[in-house]
Amino acid sequence: CETVISGKKVLLLKPSTFMNLSGQSVTEAAAFYKVPMDRVVVLFDDISLEPGASRVRRKGTDGGHNGIKNIIYLSGHDDFPRVKIGVGKKPHPDYDLADWVLSGFKKEEVEPMKNAFILAQGAVEQIVAGNIDKAMNLYNGTGRQKAQEKRAARENKAPAAPHPSQPAENAAQENPGESKA
């Protein structure tokens, strides 16, 4: 599907190959459209992140993800941006990984996953606009936010604004005339 993101024409692909063979689709499309790998953005599931968490990376290893491993192997590059979307760990070590990542989400995971897709969209918009550092700062977990809050407390300043993935803790107090509904 061709579309425009951040004012740039982009092509969105969902490989129809098995996930472990994602590199076939990605490298063929990149070659056909003459897109260098550092301009290819890959979104994928990550079992090392909690459901709904996201992480942006400029480049890196496959991290044990066979689809990413195949993209790196067939393209010969690991320097493509990626957005990881957490799906959580298997409930038991004996649970089949393919069954786990293809299963549905628990009721309590649905809202965090919806939020993850919104965050992934924002991250992709920043990456396409050429702002991968900004995407990483905005969308990579809460570690940075907690560090900012600790630093602010030491300096006796107000804490930084909440991370985009975190709900405003005092929304009702900040907007007393508005309800959550």
Give names to the regions the model predicted.
Residues 112-116:
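Short amphipathic alpha-helical coupling segments at ligand-binding clamshell hinges
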Residues 93-111:
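Short, electropositive alpha-helical surface patch
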Residues 179-180:
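N-terminal, polar/charged subdomain of small-to-medium soluble alpha/beta proteins
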Residues 1-59, 69-84, 90-96, 117-118, ...:
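Nucleotide and nucleotide-moiety/phosphate-recognizing core
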Residues 64-67:
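Hydrophobic alpha-helical segments within soluble ligand-binding/sensing domains
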